[in-house]
Regions:
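Domain-level signal for soluble alpha/beta catalytic cores
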Residues: 1-315
Length: 315
């Protein structure tokens, strides 16, 4: 029987997966269409993407349910299939491991709107949408729930509460930070800095604090965020940085950091104390494969160092 996710990361850091949205588009999803619905209509294509991540070495696969709340799915007239879509997302991610041990992290992204008094949704409506989604993910066997790409503490807190109410065995809260133009610091779109976010998530009952996406959040800035989390918080940290800085090419935003370039930051990320390392915008299975290689080299180096220290102590 495999250990719980929060127990496994105390043994050694785990490797997450990479971007899903861009991989879906490469597989044929048209811009503006509902990628989450592919869990039901094109499950073999979703499975093929996640299997490539698993084969690249991912220990954790995040479900294809980022926009899987009934509020988000309503934009595509799919709200009534929210439970079905989320359950299928877990089942597909589990299949990607091909029977080997691995962790499925159920994905809950932003609900896509604003709450009162600035928008049309009440906190109760958002909470119920997240609770329904989290419940479906947990019932299908997700090992953890991640509330990700959050910019406001209010929505993040509602998501954490909903996941806990649904009985999630592990709850991950993940903020998206934007780097300032001079690169000196970063905050969420709503002005939340890493220290405030980490303290909030720990107090709210998250099991793991995380960061993902955000403008300019490359490996180095993500490493800084990990260090800032760990300076004020006792919880494990997960990071999913982007593949470099965004660039505008032919009126499209692209991330052009190669797998080898991005993987050069793995050692520093591990030294900063990250417990789960994945990747976000612009990343591919090849990036994750490069991460796996660097992480395995790190673990082997640690093993040899430990053996040498033990031998010296016995002389």
């Amino acid at each position: 029987m495999k250990p719980r996710l929060q127990d496994a990361i105390h043994t050694r850091p785990l490797l997450g997966d990479g971007a899903m949205g861009t991989q879906l588009m490469l597989a044929g999803l048209e811009q503006g269409n509902c990628g989450e619905a592919w869990n039901l209509t094109q499950p073999e294509r979703v499975l093929a993407i996640q299997r490539r991540y698993a084969e690249a070495g991912s220990d954790c696969i995040i479900t294809n349910t980022f926009g899987g709340s009934c509020i988000m799915l309503n934009r595509h007239s799919q709200a009534g299939r929210a439970v079905e879509i989320n359950r299928a997302g877990v089942e597909i991610a589990r299949q990607a491991f091909g029977g080997r041990p691995g962790y499925v992290i159920g994905d809950i992204g932003p609900f896509g709107g604003l709450m009162e008094p600035y928008g049309d949704f009440t906190a109760a409506q958002v909470r119920e949408a997240f609770r329904e989604q989290a419940g479906a993910l947990v019932d299908a066997g997700a090992d953890a729930i991640i509330i990700e790409t959050q910019t406001s503490l209010e929505e993040l807190g509602i998501g954490i509460d909903a996941a806990r109410e649904a009985g999630a065995p592990c709850v991950i809260g993940s903020m998206a930070y934007d780097v300032t133009l001079d690169g000196s610091t970063f905050r969420s779109m709503m002005g939340v800095d890493p220290e405030r976010a980490a303290k909030f998530m720990e107090e709210r009952g998250a099991n793991i604090v995380a960061l993902n996406c955000g403008t300019g959040m490359d490996m180095e800035h993500a490493r800084q965020a990990v260090a800032r989390y760990r300076a004020v918080c006792t919880l494990p940290v997960m990071a999913q940085p982007n593949a470099g800085q965004p660039k505008l090419v032919d009126m499209k935003v692209v991330y052009d950091e190669t797998p080898e370039q991005m993987a050069r930051g793995v050692e520093a990320m591990l030294a900063a104390g990250v417990s789960i390392l994945g990747a976000c915008c612009g990343s591919t299975p090849e990036h994750i494969r490069a991460f796996r290689s660097r992480m395995d080299e790190h673990f082997e180096s640690q093993r040899r160092r430990s053996e040498l220290e033990h031998e010296n102590q016995t002389l």
